[in-house]
């Protein structure tokens, strides 16, 4: 009964944890590393073919983005998640695969001229489609038997439609334990979705800490504040450019803008045009407009009953092709442009930034968390120039951090969430927080009477004995290109070592001659590089 940590350990992306019990291995999430957190997404610290079950907390790419790689490299087990997470995950993984293929094509065009080796995409659209051969779904509060000695219950985490905290009941060799994986804990009073449902009992808790060191700014009215920004900017003849996550945050923005238009809060340009420049956002919005029984909050349910279309309003335009996207920047009409990616590291948003950052009458409004190392974070931190598509762009636009609009619980609500457990858990593993946040939040939990620590990469913990098996290490994250290369090589070494260990475990029962030969080669290799 062991718990392994393979991602989002003292960082906020790449969530991946593995439970080992009764000869089975159960993975919880398999996310993409992003921004400064990235080591090397190609290398998994375990053998995919040895994973029996994958549980998915929600559809965001930092929790799902390496599932196609998992399947591509040999996973053929069961994938379990909620119905709406499965719907959103299909859209997001296909979009992610398209980005992977496009990025590889771009690198190969450049690399061919420079004589570099061919680069394969991390995975393809077909790899993403293959994931859904293994997906099964459940609803909230439904108890699902996973394998001998393990059952799962998904509870609404209030972070995104379909998002869940997952509680596992465990039994091995007569030992009974319960472990809860928080997933991403949602903020309260968000439009559309319900507040996070509190959990009551667990021996162990794996808990996120994204905002473990701060509270959200109190906002009197999201609608009024956004209307003020739009009114001021459009009145000056500029554009409001909003980098946004295509799934969840874009739909919230549409919800607010519908209210703004209904209440006629923008005086300078009452019928202002809004462009959703993200095919992914368009596809996701169709899910948000579908069968949401069991997922919506009460206010949203009332709107649906009244026949209100929550995400549509006059002069809303959905941009399809890249040609249409480019034409937006040729049109001088003041407008609102909502585009992905939310952290500005990829996607069409980068073109809109190129054409608007230098304009003093435009505004760039950040409505999403910006990870360290991303372009979005650099803009929020006040950088004066950025390079986009090989061109240096001056930052003269108004940069607005639309605080308070977050799908993550803040510090006080995280504390409230963990305090709901009665009795206190035996141990709390703090994950999904920056290197300077997760340990501090863990220490605060200790001061509140919990036993907690911030988990490290490759850490292993024996849940039956309540003791650390191996401590793991703090990965060196991406800082510079040179540093990143060193990190990637080290990650490959660790991944190779993990694969070797998995292979060695499967050698039980082989002829003694083979085992002896392999042992000799491993020892020889270690001795060769020991110095």
Residues covered by each model-derived region:
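Short, compositionally biased "basic patch" segments
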Residues: 191-206, 292-299, 370-396
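A polyampholytic, Gly/Pro-enriched intrinsically disordered region
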Residues: 100-105, 292-305, 469-494
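His/Asp/Glu-rich metal-coordinating catalytic cores
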Residues: 1-55, 60, 64, 71-252, ...
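Short, surface-exposed amphipathic charged segments that create phosphate/polyanion-binding patches used
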Residues: 150-154, 287-295, 415-417, 465-475
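Generic long, charged, amphipathic alpha-helical segments
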Residues: 387-418
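A general structural motif
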Residues: 185, 218-223, 312-324, 343-345, ...
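C-terminal, active-site-flanking charged/polar segments
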Residues: 359, 434-477
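Hard-cation-handling environments
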Residues: 229-374, 386-387, 422, 437-439, ...
């Amino acid at each position: 009964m062991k718990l392994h940590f393979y991602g989002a350990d003292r960082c906020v992306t790449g969530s991946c944890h593995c439970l080992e019990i009764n000869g089975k291995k159960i993975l919880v999430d398999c996310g993409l590393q992003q921004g400064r957190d990235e080591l090397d997404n190609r290398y998994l610290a375990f053998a995919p073919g040895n994973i029996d079950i994958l549980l998915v907390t929600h559809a965001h790419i930092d929790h799902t983005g390496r599932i196609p790689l998992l399947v591509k490299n040999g996973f053929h087990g069961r994938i379990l998640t909620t119905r709406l997470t499965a719907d959103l995950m299909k859209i997001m993984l296909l979009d992610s695969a398209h980005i992977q293929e496009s990025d590889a094509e771009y690198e190969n065009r450049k690399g061919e001229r420079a004589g570099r080796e061919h680069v394969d995409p991390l995975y393809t659209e077909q790899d993403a489609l293959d994931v859904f051969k293994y997906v099964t779904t459940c609803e909230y509060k439904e108890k699902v038997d996973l394998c001998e000695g393990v059952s799962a219950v998904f509870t609404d985490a209030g972070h995104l439609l379909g998002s869940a905290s997952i509680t596992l009941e465990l039994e091995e060799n007569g030992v009974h334990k319960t472990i809860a994986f928080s997933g991403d804990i949602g903020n309260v009073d968000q439009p559309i979705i319900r507040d996070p449902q509190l959990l009551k009992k667990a021996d162990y808790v794996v808990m996120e800490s994204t905002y473990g060191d701060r509270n959200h700014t109190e906002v009197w009215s999201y609608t009024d504040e956004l209307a003020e920004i739009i009114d001021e900017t459009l009145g000056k003849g500029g554009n409001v450019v909003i980098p946004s996550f295509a799934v969840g945050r874009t739909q919230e923005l549409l919800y607010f803008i519908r209210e703004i238009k209904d209440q006629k809060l923008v005086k300078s340009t009452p019928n202002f045009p809004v462009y959703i420049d993200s095919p992914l956002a368009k596809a996701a919005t169709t899910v948000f407009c579908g069968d949401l029984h069991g997922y919506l909050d009460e206010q949203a349910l009332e709107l649906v009953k009244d026949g209100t279309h929550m995400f549509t309003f006059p002069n809303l335009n959905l941009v399809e092709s890249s040609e249409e996207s480019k034409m937006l920047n040729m049109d001088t009409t003041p407008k609102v442009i909502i585009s992905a990616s939310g952290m500005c590291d990829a996607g069409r948003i980068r073109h809109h930034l190129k054409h608007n950052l230098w304009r003093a009458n435009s505004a760039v409004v950040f409505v999403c968390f910006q990870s360290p190392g991303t372009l979005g974070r650099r803009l929020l931190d006040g950088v004066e120039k950025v390079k986009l598509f090989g061109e240096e762009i001056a930052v003269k636009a108004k940069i607005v951090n639309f605080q308070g609009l977050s799908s993550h619980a803040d510090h006080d609500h995280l504390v409230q969430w963990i305090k709901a457990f009665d009795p206190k858990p035996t141990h709390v593993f703090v994950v999904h927080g920056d290197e300077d946040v997760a340990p501090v939040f863990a220490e605060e939990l200790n001061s509140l009477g919990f036993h907690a620590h911030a988990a490290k990469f490759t850490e292993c913990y024996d849940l039956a004995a309540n003791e650390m098996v191996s401590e793991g290490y703090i990965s060196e994250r991406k800082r510079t290109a040179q540093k990143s290369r060193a990190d990637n090589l080290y990650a490959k070494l660790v991944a190779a070592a993990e694969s070797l260990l998995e292979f060695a475990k499967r050698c039980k029962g082989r002829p003694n001659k083979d085992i002896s030969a392999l042992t000799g080669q491993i020892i020889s290799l270690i001795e060769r590089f020991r110095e």
